UniProtKB/Swiss-Prot annotation:
This is Neurogenic protein big brain. The keyword Cell membrane does not apply. A motif (NPA 2) lies at residues 238-240. Gene3D superfamilies: Glycerol uptake facilitator protein. GO terms for biological process: cell differentiation; cell-cell adhesion; mesoderm development; nervous system development; transmembrane transport; water transport. Residues 439-451, 462-472, 487-532, 576-587, 659-686 have a biased composition (Low complexity). Residues 94-97, 168-189, 235-256 are extracellular. Residues 599-616 have a biased composition (Pro residues).
Amino acid sequence: MADESLHTVPLEHNIDYHIVTLFERLEAMRKDSHGGGHGVNNRLSSTLQAPKRSMQAEIRTLEFWRSIISECLASFMYVFIVCGAAAGVGVGASVSSVLLATALASGLAMATLTQCFLHISGAHINPAVTLALCVVRSISPIRAAMYITAQCGGGIAGAALLYGVTVPGYQGNLQAAISHSAALAAWERFGVEFILTFLVVLCYFVSTDPMKKFMGNSAASIGCAYSACCFVSMPYLNPARSLGPSFVLNKWDSHWVYWFGPLVGGMASGLVYEYIFNSRNRNLRHNKGSIDNDSSSIHSEDELNYDMDMEKPNKYQQSQGTYPRGQSNGNGGGQAAGNGQHQAANMGQMPGVVANAGQGNYCQNLYTAPPLSSKYDQQQEPLYGGTRSLYCRSPTLTRSNLNRSQSVYAKSNTAINRDIVPRPGPLVPAQSLYPMRTQQQQQQQQQQQQQVAPAPQSSHLQNQNVQNQMQQRSESIYGMRGSMRGQQQPIQQQQQQQQQQQLQQQQPNMGVQQQQMQPPPQMMSDPQQQPQGFQPVYGTRTNPTPMDGNHKYDRRDPQQMYGVTGPRNRGQSAQSDDSSYGSYHGSAVTPPARHPSVEPSPPPPPMLMYAPPPQPNAAHPQPIRTQSERKVSAPVVVSQPAACAVTYTTSQGSAVTAQQQQQQQQQQQQQQQQQQQQMMMQQQQQHYGMLPLRPN
């Protein structure tokens, strides 16, 4: 394998990270369903529930501007109601009446406005609440700044409207402040604003928390908190409420106290609730820590097993050879033992077992291969070599592991074997789909050699049948005709012509008349048309032109391919069915004249196709077949362009003496021996167009 290195996946693209996030969100939804039985809690502000977005994208949203408008309108109504209640009591009213009117108006107004605008903007209606939410990162800084601006603007607008509609004699108590509060020092008033604002903001956080299980309505809780705090020396509790009357009446005495006290108290309340009293964050941190511990323990266990697997082959490599699982450096044993002790201590395991692993006394597990007891033992692969768990690293794959299960679409090794040079040796023909029974053909050949003809008139026909059967053995079932029918090697033509001349000289007294057309002299004498090299087995036959003299040979019937003449040609021959089996009839329109005095020329031998060489020896010869059986399995002989009509006539009535029969039998045996020798020479000269079989 070219590359066996392990690649780690980043945390953002790891499936474990997404699974943990999914479980966290499901837990939040479950807690929302359990604690959300009230309508106000289910309609929390989108500022607390919306996902984090960039400030530029947040400004472009409609929800952002709707929230700002709702905060401005709520602050306007709150300042107008609270300051109007204090001013309505009158200038000479008692302190208790002013305090009661202001506290009730503040609590009821805040409860009503919270119920109206909680699902839109969160119903802050107080810069201290907005700043506390910004500190704990519940809202963005740009939203907090816009909220505070809208709240201050709404407060100024409410105070201005109230100042305009108030009777001139009742404008003195417009600030809704008790007269004795002026006797207190600045730091005393700062402490009162800090403590009371801390309580109000804490009540807001608890009431609007969707994870908190409580009894009652969030709007009522917030209103009660404002009312209770207003009964204590009537503080402002809201910088926007102090800014509006001060701006309209132009009274700025110790105005910084009413800004810094509520803002600092609100920020302190938000931080305390977020990091101390917020159950959601505590559960989230606890779950995240437990998940990290579990994953770290799983990682440590897998790394421990992996390091042990990497270490053990390194020990046995020194004495028993290499190990196919992986490689490690020289310090792998010490590091694995040290890491194993540390990780085992974190997981609560026995460090002694892991420490002994570096010394060889380790515990066998399912994923490791047992050590080799001797050099004769074969190396065994682990029972399961895949990924052991969701969090562990896969072991280094080897070629042996890949050979276990190969896919259907596995890459073949044809490209590898393509460049391999075949081994030297004898050429072995490829095995055909249909088996070529060479042994049976050899047995038939031996039987035909031992067969003796009963009558002299059929001796030449029997020799022709032997040639046809020999031609059948030399042809393959996938054989095709060559591109030039009349081309053969000169040596084979000369040998076959000599054979035919000897046959004609040895049978001068037989009553057989043969007539054969001579081929054109240009085909026999032209050396360019004769093949000079190897003739391809799968050649394509070229169609002759109409002006060519060979076009008459292309009009043969399909029956003439097998050397059998049709019914229309049988009338021209006086032979029987058996004798006409081996006769060849040309495709000429007019039969040639018969001249017994002219010495016939030997016919061209049939073209030999590709075939495996027959074995010389046969164990069991088959029984002799008759002429009718040989007629059924008609041999296929490809006729040459120079072939012409040949007819044989036998004189069955002529008396033959026993001496002539013996001479003919001797001649036939000599001819058969010569034919066998010539066939062996031809087979040695044949070329095969097959490559040797490649080794697997």
